[in-house]
Every structure is written in structure tokens, then in C-alpha cells.
Amino acid sequence: MANAHQLIDCFNDTMHRIQTDPFLRAETMKSKADTVVYPVFWDNNQAAYFAKWLYFDSCDVEVVADTTFSAARKYLRNGNEKKRVAVLNFANPHYAGGGVEHGAMAQEECLCRSSNLYPCLFAPCAQAEYYQFNRNRSDHLFTDRVVYTPDVVVFKDDQPVPQLLPREQWFRVDVLTCAAPYLGEPVHITPSDLKALFKSRIREICRVAMEHQVTTVVLGAFGCGAFRNPPELVARAFCEVLQEELYKHSFSKVVFAIKSNGRPDDNYNLFSKVLGQE
């Protein structure tokens, strides 16, 4: 297992490459400029959205024992120019990249060590309308707001300490940044209300992906690690939303990338059971 010093060095190397490699620097500037925050996506003019959203006869839902970027890369390999893949970043709601500068090991930090996502999250709109907005809130449930960053460049692998990929293996993927509720502090919410909150947040994540004509979305055990949300409840919230009429035709594939520790009660097995993968 990697230690914090190794992960800090890796992140510093990632940032150095972003700042000094002409290609990465240019791509980062573009993705940062194109980053957008969706405060509340839904409004009364639903027909305008339906007109440009993609429609699929069916959606293939899959649970894989994999990391986020590794799963995304596999679904980009078939050369289909119409395929657009987005991944969900399990955000720290207050600070871009969470504890990546200090060697933290959660999902968001892993994404930031392997790609140019971190500087993109410092887009002025993201800082003002997402991070500052959440810092101004007094609860730990946070918000349905989503930050959308297109064409993030992944240029390191997903080893415990990510290593530089050969340049011909670099790839682009869109990133949806959103925070789950945090149950590590006392929160007065019933299981049914928590499930309803998750379903609302999941719908917003899906709508933003649909707005950008994403065909494959890579999700995961959203909020079920450091944020201490019950994985079976979260999995059922995802399952129920993806069975709703609007969302069951909105993507070609939905992938839940969840690393497995081999225990029968781990997040991978719980999500597999709920989503019918066993």
C-alpha cells in the first residue's frame, strides 16, 4: 500500500506535468474554461430538454470490480466516435480535490493524481457556485448541484501510486463532480428521507450527463466510504432511479466501478446484489 509521502510526491509530479507539458497545459486551460455548474437543472420547460437528449431502447447496467478511470477507459476503446463517457467524482463539497495535497486516498484524490482534473475544479464558477456555496451551508447533507468538466485528460494509470502512461494511451473523459451527504457527523434524517435525498441527487447527476449527450456513465458506491452512507440504501436509490421511465432510456450503459476487498458484505457485493448482477 502506498504511503502519504509517495502519494504527495505523485500529485506534485502530476501538477508539474500539467504546468510544463504544452499539450496538458493547453487541454487544462480549455477544460477549465468549459467547466460549468448546474445549480438546479430541472425547470418547467421539460420538452426543450427532451428534444436534445439521446434515447436508447435499453440501458445495460453493470457492476465491475474496477477503478473509475480504468472502467471508463475500457468503454472508450471501441472507436465509436458517437460514444461519450462521463465519470462521477465523489466530491469533497468544500474544497476541490479533497485531501489530495496531503496524500489522502479516497476516490476523488485518486482521480486528481491520475489526470488534470484538479486545476479544472478551480474554475471561477466551480469555486463560487459549488465550493463556496457548500461552505456557506450549516448542514452536512450538501446540495444537488453538479460541476461538469469536459475532456479531462487521464495520463497516469491506476496503480496505488499512479505511473505515467505512454502518451498514445492517454485518453479524455468528462467528469461529473458532486458530493454525497456526509454521515460522519450527527445528521438528523430518517432512512426514507436519506433515500429520497439520494434519489434527487442521482436524478440531477443523470440530467446533467444527459444534457451533454453522455452515452456511458461510470458511477460507483457514491458516499459509501469515508462519507459513511449505507451502501444498500444507496444502491437501491440508484436502482430505483435507473428504472424510472426517463432514465432507463437515457444511457447506453451505466457502469458501477467499485473496488472489491473480497468480503461478502463489501460495497461491490452489496451493489451487485441490489442491481441484479449476482
Predicted feature locations:
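Macrodomain-like recognition of ADP-ribose-binding/processing modules
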Residues: 1-217, 221-278
